[in-house]
Amino acid sequence: MTKSELIERLATQQSHIPAKTVEDAVKEMLEHMASTLAQGERIEIRGFGSFSLHYRAPRTGRNPKTGDKVELEGKYVPHFKPGKELRDRANIYG
């Protein structure tokens, strides 16, 4: 599901709320989550999961086109850990 599909589905389910308001709310929520992570803070949504940053240590990689070795710097990457309720709901497809 893409962001625009999410907005469309929410707007359909919440027909009493204008679609533009739903779009603005979704975009604002995602922007707030991104800025919270960028500040190094953790986000926890009970029953859904938590977002945090994990550190990736510096390493030697390879350029896929040339095969040359490339030194990659350490960096923080977003990480999502699903909550138990979400894992249980997703498990019906397993």
From Swiss-Prot:
Any GO molecular function: DNA binding
Record note on disruption phenotype: Increased in vivo levels of ATP-DnaA.
Keyword Oxidoreductase: no
Example GO BP: DNA replication
Segments crossing the lipid bilayer: none
InterPro entries (alphabetical): Hist_DNA-bd, Histone-like_DNA-bd_CS, IHF-like_DNA-bd_dom_sf, IHF_beta
Locations listed in the record: Cytoplasm
Pfam families: Bac_DNA_binding (PF00216)
Keyword terms: Conjugation, Cytoplasm, DNA recombination, DNA replication, DNA-binding, Transcription, Transcription regulation, Translation regulation
Keyword Transport in annotation: no
A GO-annotated cellular component: cytosol
Principal subcellular localization: cytoplasm
Quaternary structure and partners: Heterodimer of an alpha and a beta chain. Part of the relaxosome, a complex composed of plasmid-encoded TraI, TraM, TraY and host-encoded IHF bound to the F plasmid origin of transfer (oriT).
Assigned protein family: Belongs to the bacterial histone-like protein family.
Function, as annotated: One of the 2 subunits of integration host factor (IHF), a specific DNA-binding protein that functions in genetic recombination as well as in transcriptional and translational control. IHF in combination with the datA locus promotes ATP hydrolysis of ATP-DnaA, called DDAH (datA-dependent DnaA-ATP hydrolysis). IHF binds oriC as replication initiates, dissociates within minutes and slowly reassociates during the cell cyle; IHF binding to datA is low before initiation, rises after initiation and dissociates during the cell cycle, allowing IHF to coordinate replication initiation. Plays a crucial role in the lysogenic life cycle of bacteriophage lambda, as it is required not only in the recombination reaction, which inserts lambda DNA into the E.coli chromosome, but also for the synthesis of int and cI repressor, two phage proteins necessary for DNA insertion and repression, respectively. The synthesis of int and cI proteins is regulated indirectly by IHF via translational control of the lambda cII protein.
Name under which the protein is recorded: Integration host factor subunit beta
Organism: Escherichia coli (strain K12)
Encoding gene (name): ihfB
